[in-house]
Design a protein with these regions (language model features):
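Conserved helicase ATPase motor motifs in RecA-like P-loop NTPase domains
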Residues: 1, 27
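Phosphate-interacting basic helix/loop segments used at nucleotide- and nucleic-acid interfaces
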Residues: 7
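Walker A/P-loop
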Residues: 4
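P-loop NTPase motor domains
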Residues: 11-21, 28-210
Length: 210
């Protein structure tokens, strides 16, 4: 139905006008936008004939500035963030925690902050949860009740989250949104293409990235 070509055309026009673009490549067919066409390509004669028919006199093959991204680091630059930057509120929503479990997660973050513990990846968070569970009685006086059952639930949710590939998303260096807002030397906006074909099979991880 031409949806891919329509999307590519819109993205090209934004790029040509100096506007960076983000594209999620769900079907794996957007990457061709980065490569210039050629008169030797299939159907090139039909394209050129159509260009003349509609009066497109400056028709020419041209590539586009593109950067490929992949949360798994397989088909593009890896995208990373830290547990600290994600924060307890968003993590709690992604793991479908109830109010009590979210409260324990908040305590874990506060405990890490008060003790200068870095929360970079899932292993860091698991370690802090273990520390909180082991010292639940002592920490409860300062932070509030820490239910070991809630800690166990959070740990199980983290394992399920990790099984979707989340471990590859959390780490350093952390992604900066400005990485998506760049132009090339000629003033054309970069087309940031996210490899989402595999990512779509892990909805929670996809939602985490967005």
């Amino acid at each position: 139905t031409g949806k891919t070509v329509t999307l590519q055309t819109i993205a090209e026009q934004f790029s040509a006008n100096g506007v960076p673009v983000f594209l999620a490549d769900v079907k794996g067919d957007l990457s061709g936008i980065a490569m210039a066409g050629s008169p030797e390509f299939k159907n090139a004669d039909k394209l050129e004939a159509r260009a003349k028919e509609i009066g497109l006199t400056d028709y020419a093959y041209r590539d586009n500035p593109a950067v490929f991204w992949d949360l798994y680091g397989e088909q593009g630059h890896p995208i990373r963030t830290t547990i600290s930057e994600m924060g307890p509120l968003l993590l709690a929503r992604l793991m479908d925690l109830n109010d009590t479990q979210e409260g324990v997660l908040n305590i874990a973050f506060r405990y890490a902050d008060d003790n200068g513990l870095l929360l970079i990846d899932l292993e860091d968070l698991q370690s802090v949860l273990v520390a909180c569970a082991e010292a639940a009685k002592e920490l409860g006086v300062r932070y509030g009740n820490i239910s070991k059952a809630s800690v166990g639930t959070i740990q199980r949710q983290l394992l399920a989250f990790e099984s979707q590939g989340a471990a590859k998303f959390f780490g350093e260096p952390a992604f900066e949104i400005n990485d998506f807002l760049r132009c090339d030397e000629g003033g054309r906006g970069y087309l940031n293409i996210l490899a989402a074909e595999k990512l779509m099979q892990s909805p929670k991880l996809y939602a985490t990235f967005l």
